């Protein structure tokens, strides 16, 4: 029997509730709060049920700047998880925080949200240079959550810090109304010129104007992104653990996998394997036991 390719979900938010872990905003005007936990064990059960081997855990925006629960979960289950945290881009001491989470709590990088800060280009902020230098020194990973109008910020830092691996979350949100020319999305595709920038092709159904699998109105832009970045620099990701997926408007994990395996018919078997896990196995350090 041929060996099954390792499947890696590169984007799942987990969280706990007080008193186990704090809940609260980590960005201006962010008021969302969960009603129940979405913990590591819920994600593990979902993975087992759907034959997903590994997951990149990402700190949520409603879990404060304290990354401890996410970091501890990855340390507890090193064969299953790695972790990505948050640090405050407006805190002038954030370099110290980045060093702590990477050196002491095994986090492999951080997520930033330029779209949450309308008054400042947070990635280009001079005060963040020390932080990015420390992340770069550790060959860290930074994932960027924003929209096409913020692509210029990633263009700047990807060139300035070539030792960081930069990830575009959720394709940077292309919308079907950008078709047929997709001019509004071209600044995102242009980021492929940086060899250290990769893209998570995820959250597809929430961008689609269709309610039906396989959300075909998104296929042209997915193909454009895969052509621009190449199948060695695209990765699969989802969103929330367990029942929280459907409850929060995401597809179930089974349907997320079905979308790729049945809906992305243009991918060869080898390309699908790279997208669903091979590339992620190369980007993160999974040898931590």
What feature does the model see in each segment?
Residues 121-236, 244, 282, 288:
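Catalytic pocket-lining loop regions of alpha/beta-barrel enzymes
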């Amino acid at each position: 029997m041929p060996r099954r390719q390792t499947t890696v979900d590169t984007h799942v938010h987990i969280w706990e509730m007080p008193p186990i872990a704090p809940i609260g905003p980590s960005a201006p005007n962010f008021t969302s709060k969960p009603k129940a936990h979405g913990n590591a064990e819920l994600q593990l059960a979902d993975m087992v049920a759907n034959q997903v081997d590994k997951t990149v855990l990402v700190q949520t925006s409603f879990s404060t700047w304290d990354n401890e629960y996410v970091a501890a979960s990855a340390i507890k289950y090193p064969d299953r998880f790695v972790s990505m945290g948050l640090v405050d881009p407006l805190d002038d001491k954030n370099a110290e925080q980045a060093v702590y989470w990477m050196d002491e709590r095994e986090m492999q990088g951080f997520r930033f949200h330029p779209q949450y800060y309308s008054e400042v280009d947070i990635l280009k902020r001079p005060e963040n240079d020390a932080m990015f230098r420390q992340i770069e020194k550790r060959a860290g990973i930074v994932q960027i959550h924003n929209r096409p109008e913020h692509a210029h910020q990633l263009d700047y830092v990807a060139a300035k810090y070539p030792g960081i691996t930069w990830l575009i979350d959720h394709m940077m949100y292309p919308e079907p109304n950008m078709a047929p020319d997709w001019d509004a999305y071209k600044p995102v595709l242009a980021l492929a010129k940086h060899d250290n920038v990769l893209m998570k092709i995820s959250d597809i159904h929430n961008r689609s104007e269709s309610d039906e699998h396989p959300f075909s109105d998104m296929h042209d832009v997915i193909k454009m992104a895969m052509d621009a970045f190449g199948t060695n620099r695209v990765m699969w990701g989802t969103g929330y653990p367990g029942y929280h997926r459907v409850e929060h408007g995401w597809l179930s994990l089974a349907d997320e996998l079905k979308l790729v395996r049945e809906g992305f018919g243009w991918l060869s078997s080898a390309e699908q394997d790279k997208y669903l896990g091979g590339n992620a196995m190369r980007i993160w350090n999974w040898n931590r036991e």
